[in-house]
Regions:
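Hydrophobic membrane-insertion alpha-helices, especially the h-region
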Residues: 3-13
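Extracytoplasmic metal-acquisition and chelation regions
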Residues: 11-295
Length: 295
């Protein structure tokens, strides 16, 4: 595996919720097709690996979100991606440069796959401004749709091995559903809590889990809790595991969740957040409990 970075310019040559798909009794597998696939980040790479296993070649460009955001592509990058069979990207502002990069690619035999196809994207609510929320991959159904898009794109490029990719997709979905189901009862018990969010970053996750949320406005946290008639003992404040917060929350229940973690697959990221939330199912009422777990 080669991690593609800006150093490509040095001259390295490399280059709707979907249900379980229907399968047939007769399985055939041909190994005469070898696809070269490029993804933007490592979690997308992990999605592809669930479908192809070791059959094809897949590479990724970045791990860190900051590197993705600040990326400036070169002619060498354009040429390398253009020589791939598939280029897979999130399809949102998570990769702010993706639209212009795609415009400059030499399409030829290159397939360009938008993972957000079929996903109902949410927006940030910021005064009179509406901005797209790119973190759809933290949502359960949204992740399934994205994985389905990966599977469908690979099947389209390698139809002779359609059944092989179909089976791998079904296995991945069943495993994911089984892991989430383990926490189903604990998640239901969270209905007694009110989750205060500091922004919209975790909207996909909280909606997926039907959490009772309320977003902090410009009031001080103590005043906000009082105005909204909230029980401080039954309030949990969601804090970004990466960015944290400058607010003094030492007197309140908090939980650290992650909207993106480059070294963790999207399904593992969802499961991590679910596990952290589930810890509150048996938590005793206290006046000050702080959760500081990190990925």
């Amino acid at each position: 595996m080669v991690i593609i970075t800006i150093a490509l310019s040095l001259g390295m040559s490399l280059f709707s919720s979907p249900l379980l798909a229907n399968t047939e009794n007769n399985r055939t597998e041909s190994r005469d097709k070898y696809l070269n696939i490029m993804t933007v980040n490592k979690p997308q790479y992990d999605m592809v690996k669930k479908i192809i296993k070791d059959k094809c070649n897949v590479q990724y460009m970045f791990t860190n979100e900051k590197d993705i955001s600040e990326f400036k592509y070169s002619e060498s990058v354009l040429n390398n991606i253009s020589n791939m069979d598939l280029f897979i990207y999130s399809g949102t502002s998570f990769e702010p440069w993706s639209a212009s990069l795609i415009d400059e690619l030499k399409k030829g035999n290159l397939g360009i796959i938008n993972l957000a196809r079929g996903v109902r994207l949410l927006n940030y609510s910021n005064e009179n401004n509406t901005k797209e929320n790119p973190y759809y991959f933290e949502g359960i159904e949204e992740y399934k749709i994205a994985l389905y898009n990966v599977k469908a794109a690979i099947q389209d490029r390698d139809p002779q091995n359609r059944d092989y990719y179909e089976d791998n997709y079904n296995i991945a979905i069943k495993e994911f559903d089984k892991n989430i189901k383990l926490y189903e009862d604990k998640l239901k018990s969270l209905s007694e809590y009110r989750f205060i969010t500091l922004n919209n970053d975790f909207d996909y996750l909280t909606k997926s889990l039907n959490l009772n949320t309320i977003q902090l406005d410009n009031h001080e946290i103590a005043e906000f809790i009082k105005i909204n008639n909230l029980d401080p003992k039954k309030v949990i404040i969601i804090v970004d595991g990466e960015n944290g917060t400058k607010l003094d929350l030492s007197a309140y229940n908090t939980i650290k969740l992650w909207k993106y973690y480059g070294d963790m697959s999207f399904d593992d990221l969802i499961l991590y957040n679910v596990k952290e939330l589930s810890k509150w199912a048996k938590a005793k009422e206290t006046t000050s409990v702080t959760t500081t777990s990190e990925a």
